[in-house]
Amino acid sequence: MLKHIIPLIPSHRLYTEAFCGGAAVLFAKSPVEAEIINDINMELTNFYWTAQVYYRDLKTEIDKTLHSRDLHAHAAHINAYPEFFSPAQRAWAVWALCRMSFASMMDGSFGYDFGGGMPKKVQNAKDEFTEQI
């Protein structure tokens, strides 16, 4: 779909995405002077902000993450009570829930399979989380 959307975006200096979600368009288009994102889920916008401003802190948390039901439950707790946690902890919770939940849904149950694919999926996501995102 991006191959159809990106050519329709006119030349601009300010880009606003009111319903950010996965931010696919934002990351696929060329960067501009100012980019504004918003989403009904404040934790998503916190994730993108933290990845930009506190990348090292977030990367450290992500690198320590194992595919575990307990960590999934802890991430869900952080997501339910964000006011008690730092931006990096909240961003980690978003990352962990998206990577460890059934169907990658933040409000999904713990995802597992009998073939061992989920731990590999989490490890691959850890390896792919670089400053280039």
Where are these regions (language model features)?
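Conserved SAM-binding loop and adjacent beta-strand
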Residues: 1-2
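Conserved S-adenosyl-L-methionine
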Residues: 8-69
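SAM-dependent nucleic-acid methyltransferase catalytic core
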Residues: 8-9, 51-133
